[in-house]
Amino acid sequence: MTAVQEERTTEELKALAERAGRELEDATALEILRWAAETFGDRFCVTSSMEDAVVAHLASRALPGVDVVFLDTGYHFPETIGTRDAVEAVMDVNVITLTPRQTVAEQDAEYGPKLHDRDPDLCCALRKVKPLEEGLAGYRAWATGLRRDESETRANTPVVGWDEKRGKVKISPIAKWSQEDVQTYVTEHGVLTNPLLTDGYASVGCAPCTRRVLEGEDARAGRWAGRSKTECGLHG
């Protein structure tokens, strides 16, 4: 972290993000992450759902030992926790696991069981959105694995943008990638992926709110199936 980075105001960071979004639109994912590493240093992190470790792997090439933030909601598939543990063991990253203030049992006691079925927005707010806001407090910029081809709600994702909700630079280095691009990178670099991706799941979230996708459905159709909800609140 440099003095210049520390002294940037919110307006300066916002202008930086908007300018970088334009200038880096045609850059490669690795070039985007190298820019992030050079610009923000240890005030930059990657968030990962442990669906795969592609962005974490890319970021480790740009900034060895980079912080990789993982939200343990208490509802994850065992395969997801296993992927996190494997990433921590074999990759040059520093995995930071965030947890909600309440355990699942404590939440059940206050709000009743299966809040995810009755009020999924509140459940996501308690177990994802709030913990991430607290966990990102010390960073200026964070990277995600969002891709434009995942759903209509993500079709306009910038490679670098401004996260108005959190007042941070938000970087989506693989926004322009297709699922085929992801698979090519995984194969070429031997990147860890969640075993559920080969078991019918195209997008992996909390176990109670995730199902396998059907042929012809978009990648996120298995999330909160049967509801209009398509995002947990972390990205929109």
UniProtKB/Swiss-Prot annotation:
<dbReference type="GO" id="GO:0019379">
    <property type="term" value="P:sulfate assimilation, phosphoadenylyl sulfate reduction by phosphoadenylyl-sulfate reductase (thioredoxin)"/>
</dbReference>
<keyword id="KW-0560">Oxidoreductase</keyword>
<keyword id="KW-0963">Cytoplasm</keyword>
<protein>
    <recommendedName>
        <fullName>Adenosine 5'-phosphosulfate reductase</fullName>
        <ecNumber>1.8.4.10</ecNumber>
    </recommendedName>
</protein>
<dbReference type="GO" id="GO:0004604">
    <property type="term" value="F:phosphoadenylyl-sulfate reductase (thioredoxin) activity"/>
</dbReference>
<feature type="binding site">
    <location>
        <position position="123"/>
    </location>
    <ligand>
        <name>[4Fe-4S] cluster</name>
    </ligand>
</feature>
<dbReference type="InterPro" id="IPR014729">
    <property type="entry name" value="Rossmann-like_a/b/a_fold"/>
</dbReference>
<dbReference type="InterPro" id="IPR002500">
    <property type="entry name" value="PAPS_reduct_dom"/>
</dbReference>
<comment type="similarity">
    <text>Belongs to the PAPS reductase family. CysH subfamily.</text>
</comment>
<comment type="function">
    <text>Catalyzes the formation of sulfite from adenosine 5'-phosphosulfate (APS) using thioredoxin as an electron donor.</text>
</comment>
<feature type="binding site">
    <location>
        <position position="209"/>
    </location>
    <ligand>
        <name>[4Fe-4S] cluster</name>
    </ligand>
</feature>
<feature type="binding site">
    <location>
        <position position="124"/>
    </location>
    <ligand>
        <name>[4Fe-4S] cluster</name>
    </ligand>
</feature>
<keyword id="KW-0408">Iron</keyword>
<dbReference type="GO" id="GO:0046872">
    <property type="term" value="F:metal ion binding"/>
</dbReference>
<dbReference type="GO" id="GO:0051539">
    <property type="term" value="F:4 iron, 4 sulfur cluster binding"/>
</dbReference>
<dbReference type="GO" id="GO:0005737">
    <property type="term" value="C:cytoplasm"/>
</dbReference>
<dbReference type="InterPro" id="IPR004511">
    <property type="entry name" value="PAPS/APS_Rdtase"/>
</dbReference>
<feature type="binding site">
    <location>
        <position position="206"/>
    </location>
    <ligand>
        <name>[4Fe-4S] cluster</name>
    </ligand>
</feature>
<dbReference type="GO" id="GO:0070814">
    <property type="term" value="P:hydrogen sulfide biosynthetic process"/>
</dbReference>
<keyword id="KW-0479">Metal-binding</keyword>
<dbReference type="Pfam" id="PF01507">
    <property type="entry name" value="PAPS_reduct"/>
</dbReference>
<keyword id="KW-0411">Iron-sulfur</keyword>
<comment type="pathway">
    <text>Sulfur metabolism; hydrogen sulfide biosynthesis; sulfite from sulfate.</text>
</comment>
<feature type="active site" description="Nucleophile; cysteine thiosulfonate intermediate">
    <location>
        <position position="232"/>
    </location>
</feature>
<dbReference type="GO" id="GO:0043866">
    <property type="term" value="F:adenylyl-sulfate reductase (thioredoxin) activity"/>
</dbReference>
